[in-house]
A protein has these predicted regions:
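Polysaccharide-binding surfaces and accessory modules of carbohydrate-active proteins
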Residues: 3-9, 13, 26-201, 667
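Conserved structural scaffold segments of CAZyme catalytic domains across common CAZy folds
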Residues: 86, 98, 102-104, 113-123, ...
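Short, acidic/polar
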Residues: 284-298, 407-420, 531
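Aromatic- and acidic-residue-enriched carbohydrate-binding clefts of CAZyme catalytic domains
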Residues: 305-326, 358-402, 435-462
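Active-site-adjacent "subsite" loops/lids of carbohydrate-active enzymes
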Residues: 328, 334, 342-422, 498-510
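Active-site neighborhood of glycoside hydrolase catalytic domains
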Residues: 398-488, 500
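C-terminal beta-strand-rich structural cap/linker in extracellular carbohydrate-active enzymes
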Residues: 662-682
């Protein structure tokens, strides 16, 4: 049978689909520049199913022998795929909405097959040709830009929301033409998702896709509509412009946007907004309070303490029984408080130890097991870390189901006691923003089996309930997952220590949530080059600095450089909590790049950045802009910059005097070693 093509046009974007025994993505074109982004056809999507009788999982692509029917309506195309021998009784309906300069895809699944359950479905895959000038954005942590050809192959799939996918969008662009395609999942009350980028070895095609783990996985015939709309849109520019498309949608539509004014979050206490620096303080010795005070005095700036191991139970063991606290906890907290240091203790927000009193099952079988996540056969999902029981075996921690009343009350009661008994300033509830949604299938729980919106909704309900424990509840969590920010005031950005980072998350959300700290403990040997990279990035990205142990601070090199950056963060805090990140300046410099292979959270431990980092911020009350440049090299750097500021003469502040002349948005200057320079634009 002769193949048939369908052209979907929206603004400058033209997408060609081909019916050839299934539905293929045949072309992605830019009408404005005449660019053809894709030269080789690829399947448009894939659908994964599981046989209920034997648990065998298999995946079928849109090219695997489907009958395709297309109906054209006003402003949309309707594609119905049916008759696939590998998936009998399953129909996929794909709706392409054309308008407003973009294509918006919706997906509906229909199954009358009782022998299989549908488990994961892609939205349409966006594919493009790899090349020297072709780059992609993926939302790991702060966001990362990858060259499409830097490695022979790559494949990364991350769970949204989690440490590996802070937002639900991807993008690619041609750097030489500054044109690309935004690929966003506009799901305002979001379901959990999988976010994927790949290029197979020996192939020249890069695939961007987002998938949804499906609902109703405990039985067959689990028909459903995927949540949200998959938006494809041409844009001018690079990662920042793609971020602005996601921001525009999220601010107007997303259910997680908190109330703000010209000073940022309205529900976050002022001390937290203004705090420039964090210590990672563990009660693993008697004088942690005095050590934290001594480090704060040496730093010369306000600090807060993220307080671990305050409980008698071991770390990652006997959860969730954090009370009673250690006998000397109160005195250590009092020592820090007398020095003006705010204290934020740690608890975990998702784990219950299966042996929760030493080597004994105390409450797990009675309370933990009925309320933990389980597969469709009733087997609990279990995680292990480095902690061990008294018999030497690894501690087995069950992942609790956030939909259950028992777990919601357990966390709420802990928050109540920490604020009302211990009188703490904030609470850190670990893993909520970092860990994936588990596809719980316990039929006794109040949610559909598998994926969907229930996991995120349940945690947001849990957090809302926890806020009722006290009038001054301030909650933070691990990592920067966007759908929780309405209930969470601060995100520990600890994994923002990888190669290729760009500040996309804060470009989208800076005034809506506080980001704080990175994992300096992940930098082996306290590598100086690596640490200086992230000193500079933390400042220009708008992150509250630190999250290092006081003993590491005393050992590290270049404390004067670090103190200087923290002091600047303290002095101009209002530009960060009450400001917007504008497009960062484009910079080039002649200093040696800062390279390290000692960052354990980076791919292969490797990071490689220019010596000079920069950021541009705008105060919301006045509109005044603040340009920050940091030379993290130990040598002078000749810097050329292009920045979105009016031409004119600007006074230099910080480690340079005089002025710089900006003409056609460009200027040059020579920065001293280990320096920070800033300028204002009214």
């Amino acid at each position: 049978m002769k193949s048939k093509t369908y052209t979907l046009g929206a603004g400058d974007l033209s997408v060609v689909l081909r019916d050839d025994g299934g539905l293929l993505l045949d072309a992605v074109n830019d009408a404005k520049t005449g660019s053809a982004f894709l030269s080789e056809s690829r399947p448009l999507f894939s659908l994964t199913a599981e046989r209920l009788a034997d648990d065998e999982t298999f995946t079928v692509s849109s090219a695997d022998g489907w009958t395709v029917d297309c109906t054209e309506t006003d402003g949309s195309r309707l594609f119905i795929l049916s008759g696939c021998e590998k998936l009998p009784g399953v129909t996929v309906t794909l709706i392409a909405n054309l308008g407003c300069g973009r294509i918006g895809f919706e997906t509906v699944l229909s199954s009358v097959n009782e022998e299989i359950t549908l488990t994961v479905c892609d939205w349409p895959n966006l594919c493009f040709d790899a090349g020297e000038s072709a780059f992609l954005f993926q939302p790991y942590g702060s966001g990362e830009v990858w060259s499409s050809v830097a490695r022979e192959s790559f494949s990364q799939t991350e769970n949204y929301p989690s440490y590996g996918a802070s937002m639900q969008y991807l993008a690619f662009w041609d750097e030489s033409k500054k044109r690309g395609v935004y690929y966003g999942l506009h799901d305002p009350a979001p379901a959990s998702k999988l976010i994927h980028v790949s290029r197979a070895e020996g192939e020249n095609t890069v695939t961007l896709k987002i998938s949804q783990p499906l609902e109703g996985i405990s039985k067959g015939c689990n028909s459903q509509r995927l949540y949200g709309e998959n938006v494809w849109q041409i844009f001018d520019g690079d990662w920042f412009d793609a971020a602005m498309l996601y921001r525009e949608w999220a601010i107007e539509n997303a259910s997680w946007i908190p109330e703000t004014d010209e000073n940022g979050r309205k529900d976050v206490p002022q001390w937290f907004k203004e705090n420039p620096h964090w210590w990672l303080s563990r009660m693993d010795h008697d004088n942690v309070g005095e050590e934290t005070v001594r480090a704060t005095k040496d730093l010369g700036c306000k600090s807060a303490a993220h307080f671990y191991n305050w409980h008698k139970i071991p770390y990652d063991n006997d959860y969730p029984h954090y009370f009673p606290p250690k006998d000397d906890m109160a005195e250590n907290v009092a020592v820090m408080r007398r020095a003006g240091i705010r204290v934020m203790p740690y608890i975990n927000g998702r784990l219950w130890d299966t042996k929760d009193r030493g080597n004994e099952d105390w409450q797990f079988s009675e309370k933990g097991y009925p309320n933990c996540t389980k597969d469709r056969h009733g087997k609990p999902f279990i995680e292990t870390y480095n902690s061990r029981e008294s018999d030497g075996k690894k501690v087995e921690l069950s992942i609790m189901c956030p939909s259950t009343a028992v777990w919601q009350e357990t966390v709420r009661d802990l928050v109540d006691r920490i604020f009302n008994e211990l009188k703490m300033d904030a609470i850190y509830i670990d893993q909520i923003g970092a860990a994936k949604a588990n596809p719980c299938a316990d039929k006794n729980h109040p949610h559909p089996a598998g994926g969907g919106r229930w996991w995120i909704d349940s945690y947001r309900n849990l957090l809302t309930h926890a806020h009722l424990a006290s009038d001054n509840v301030m909650i933070t969590t691990e990592c920067t997952s966007d759908p929780y920010m309405k209930q969470i005031g601060g995100y520990l950005s600890w994994l923002w220590i990888r190669d290729g980072q760009v500040p996309a998350f804060n470009a989208v959300y800076n005034e809506y949530v506080i980001t704080f700290g990175i994992s300096y403990g992940s930098i082996t040997d306290a590598d100086s080059d690596c640490m200086r990279i992230f000193f500079a990035q933390s400042l220009v990205y708008g992150v509250q600095m630190g999250w290092m142990r006081p003993d590491l601070y005393f050992r590290m090199s270049h404390k004067d450089f670090y103190r200087k950056l923290v002091k600047f963060r303290e002095t101009y805090a209002d530009y960060f909590y009450g400001g917007r990140m504008l497009r960062p300046p484009y910079l080039s410099d002649n200093a040696p790049r800062l390279v390290s292979d000692k960052c354990t959270q980076a791919i292969y431990g490797h990071v490689d950045y220019p010596a000079v980092q920069g950021g541009l911020w705008q105060r919301m009350t006045t509109g005044r802009r603040l340009l920050i440049l940091v030379n993290a090299a130990e040598v002078p750097a000749d810097v050329d910059m292009s920045v979105s500021l009016p031409d004119g003469t600007y006074a230099l502040n910080g480690d340079m005097d005089g002025s710089v002349v900006l003409k056609d948005g460009k200027a040059s200057l020579t920065m001293p070693p280990l320096s920070m320079v800033y300028m204002f634009a009214d």
